[in-house]
A protein has these predicted regions:
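Glycine-rich, aromatic-bearing surface loops/beta-hairpins
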Residues: 114-156
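Amphipathic protein-protein interaction modules
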Residues: 78-132
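Short, basic amphipathic alpha-helical segments that act as recognition/interaction helices
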Residues: 25-49
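Short runs of predominantly hydrophobic/aromatic residues within well-ordered alpha helices
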Residues: 27-30, 35, 66-70, 92-96, ...
């Protein structure tokens, strides 16, 4: 399963995504910002409300070098969520082989892509619940987004 956009992302980010330099370049930027929240919380939506069609099956150019980093964040979040001790090398190796596929364009297995989609869905729910509302400027969005990180609101 390639990346699939949580349904709420498209409408939430529609006013701050586009070709203008004052906007997010792609919807993947919004997807990634949502996924970071879910990953940091170590929480996902198992019944994620995702768009039916594929969003992407690769990383956009700006993220091309970040695939290993994103895979690492996913592995760390899943290890924490599954309570795998950091000194349990066998369990961590098994988890990595379940989530990573080196030949995949995303460097993630189908299971890994599905989990990242679920973390992103959790992230958009948190944004909608805890930020001050839908933003019409990227600057206002980032101010609110980073304030939520700095104050720990996203991690509650």
């Amino acid at each position: 399963m390639p990346f699939r956009l949580p349904k709420k992302c498209r409408s939430y980010f529609s006013d701050i995504t586009g070709r203008d330099e004052t906007l997010l370049d792609t919807l993947f930027d919004g997807y990634y910002l949502c996924a970071l929240i879910g990953l940091a919380q170590g929480k996902l939506n198992t019944n994620a409300d995702l768009e039916a069609s594929e969003f992407l099956d690769y990383y956009p150019a700006d993220y091309a070098e970040s695939g290993d980093y994103i895979a690492g964040l996913l592995i760390a979040a899943e290890a924490k969520r599954k309570a795998i001790p950091v000194d349990d090398a066998n369990a961590l190796e098994k988890l990595m082989t379940q989530l990573v596929e080196s030949q995949s364009r995303t460097r993630l297995s189908v299971e890994g892509e599905n989990l990242l989609n679920q973390y992103a869905d959790r992230g958009i729910d948190v944004i909608l619940e805890r930020m001050t509302g839908r933003h019409t400027s990227l600057e206002a969005f980032f101010q609110d987004y980073f304030e939520c990180w700095n104050s720990g609101i996203f991690l509650e």
